[in-house]
Structure formats: C-alpha cells, structure tokens
A protein has these predicted regions:
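Conserved long alpha-helical elements within nucleotide-processing catalytic cores of c-di-GMP signaling
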Residues: 4-27, 38-42, 46-47, 54-62, ...
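Residue-level recognition of strand-loop junctions within catalytic nucleotide-signaling folds
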Residues: 8, 48-53, 69, 92-93, ...
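Catalytic-core segments of nucleotide cyclases and related cyclic-nucleotide turnover enzymes
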Residues: 12, 58-61, 90-132
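Short catalytic/binding micro-motifs of nucleotide second-messenger systems
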Residues: 28-34, 66-78, 109
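Catalytic core regions of nucleotide second-messenger enzymes
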Residues: 39, 68-85, 99
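ATP/adenylate-binding site constellation spanning eukaryotic-like Ser/Thr protein kinases
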Residues: 42, 84, 115
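A structural signal for short, well-ordered beta-strand segments
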Residues: 45, 85-89
Length: 132
C-alpha cells in the first residue's frame, strides 16, 4: 500500500528493496512448494494457488499480508520502516484474464475500504446465454 510514498520518500532504490523483500517472502516458506508467484509489473504480484479453495486462498493471503506488515525494511539512509499490502483473491473461473480482472476488482475494494486487508472477489454474474 502507498508504494509511491516509499519511492517519493526514500527513492526508487528503496522501492526496489521493498519489491525484493516481498519476492523473497513469496519464495520463502509462506507458500507451498507447488504454488507459483510472479510480478505482474510495478508493485503488483500474482500468486497462483492450485488445488486451493477460495477460503484457503484468503487465509494464505492473510498470512502473507501479516508477514509483510510485521517486517522491518531498511531504507538506504538506514531508516527502518514498515509497509502494508492489500490483496485481492479470486478463484479461477473461466479464463485467466477474467480471473485477474476479478482479483483486481477485489484488490481495489481492499484499497478503497481502508487498505492492508484481503478481499475475496464476489462471484461473477452468470452471463446470459447467447442465442443463435
């Protein structure tokens, strides 16, 4: 959350330290060996959790959120600070683009309702059947 503030306060090198810290957390023991995490761009990451229910994925997201919140990161000038993150969770339903869009909507709900939380995407409405 407020990643731009980190860059504006301590510079892009410290922003990179935050991104590397989060990447190391994702590669560490917070995810299972068959989970897959990757950076989408900027400060956005995606985590694929195969064989996981929406409730289990939300719990994993909460574990990640808490771990980052409790971390202490050191800026280039030696200042120690903490960061938080908002997480949007969406079960795979249909194609990957639709799932990412649902996760993104849940992420923005988390940001718009106070940040530093995990939000599970609401089920997509069923599309009306097409007639020939």
């Amino acid at each position: 959350d407020h990643f731009k503030r980190v860059n504006d306060t301590w510079g892009h090198a410290t922003g990179d330290v935050v991104l590397v810290h989060l990447a190391r957390m994702l590669k560490g023991n917070l995810l299972r060996s068959h989970d897959l995490a990757g950076r989408l761009g900027g400060e956005e990451f995606a985590v694929l959790l195969p064989g996981t229910t929406a409730q289990e994925a939300t719990a994993i997201g909460e574990r990640l959120r808490r771990a980052l919140e409790q971390s202490h990161i050191r800026a280039g000038d030696g200042t120690s600070f903490q960061v938080t993150m908002s997480i949007g969770v969406a079960p795979l339903q249909g194609d990957a683009h639709a799932t990412l869009a649902q996760a993104d909507a849940a992420l923005y709900e988390a940001k718009n309702t106070g940040r530093n939380k995990v939000v599970l995407a609401q089920p997509a409405e069923a599309a009306p059947e097409k007639t020939p």
